[in-house]
Swiss-Prot record:
Organism: Neisseria meningitidis serogroup C / serotype 2a (strain ATCC 700532 / DSM 15464 / FAM18)
Protein name as it appears in the record: UPF0758 protein NMC1174
Lineage: Bacteria, Pseudomonadati, Pseudomonadota, Betaproteobacteria, Neisseriales
Keyword Zinc: yes
PANTHER family per UniProt: DNA REPAIR PROTEIN RADC, UPF0758 PROTEIN YEES-RELATED
TM stretches of this protein: none
One family name in Pfam for this protein: RadC
MPN domain ranges (all copies): 102-224
Span of the annotated motif JAMM motif: 173-186
Length: 225
């Protein structure tokens, strides 16, 4: 049965208009983006199938075009739509972060980092550069490595902070393997970086580790020097 044959109150678009987007399931929201299904499957059925295949909405929305194209009804148009949605969401979160006092709004930082780094396939490190009021100046990518290796040079982070006239910074990196727990190397690197930043009167406020499911804060774990 096509969605047009459903009771009006159960159709995703009508349901959104009547009850708001939060009332829709992941599959219903995705169906609105997909617009149409495939032969024998409504857009909602296709959305449910794709969510089951990819395991989560985040993995589906960040899938590469080649992988999406392996599924009937999916291709470059769907990939483009998903990429646009992700980028709009990232920019909205960045705007919220830019307007917030970072230390008083750690959830916004965590949400931004999860959205920005959580679905990366390789390890990526970023720095959030802050002014004296702990407001965001800029977000800069520090490095991008393989799944198991990522090299960050402390002197480059120090130079970046000075070039941006930052008073403090937060660093973050993802663990593509899925475990958010800090390694001994993560802890030692954080200590060395904090010491180096103190020599130029810039504070290292926190170090976050990000996975697709969670975010860990060194400060909350009691691991900041």
């Amino acid at each position: 049965m096509s969605i047009k044959q459903w009771p009006e109150g159960e159709r995703p678009r009508e349901k959104l208009l009547e009850r708001g987007a939060a009332a829709l399931s992941d599959a219903e929201l995705l169906a609105i983006l997909l617009r149409v299904g495939t032969r024998g499957m409504s857009a909602v059925d296709l959305a449910r199938y794709l969510l089951q295949e990819f395991g989560s909405l985040g993995r589906l929305m960040s899938a590469e075009v080649g992988k999406l194209s392996a599924y009937k009804g999916m291709g470059t148009a769907s990939f483009t739509q998903f990429a646009v949605v992700r980028e709009i969401g990232r920019r909205i979160l960045a705007e919220e972060l830019q307007e917030s006092i970072v230390l008083s709004d750690p959830d916004t930082v965590a949400d931004y980092l999860r959205f920005h780094l959580g679905q990366e396939k390789v390890e990526v490190s970023v720095a959030l550069l802050l002014n004296r009021q702990n407001q965001l100046i800029a977000v800069r990518e520090l490095s991008r490595g393989t799944v198991a290796e990522n090299t960050i040079y402390i002197r480059e982070i120090v130079k970046l902070a000075l070039d941006e006239y930052a008073d403090s910074l937060i660093i973050a990196h993802n663990h593509p393997g899925g475990s958010p727990e800090p390694s001994q190397e993560d802890i030692m690197f954080t200590r060395r970086l904090a010491q180096a930043m103190s020599l130029v009167d810039v504070s290292l406020l926190d170090h976050f580790i990000v996975t697709s499911q969670s975010v860990r804060s060194f400060r909350q774990l009691g691991l900041m020097p």
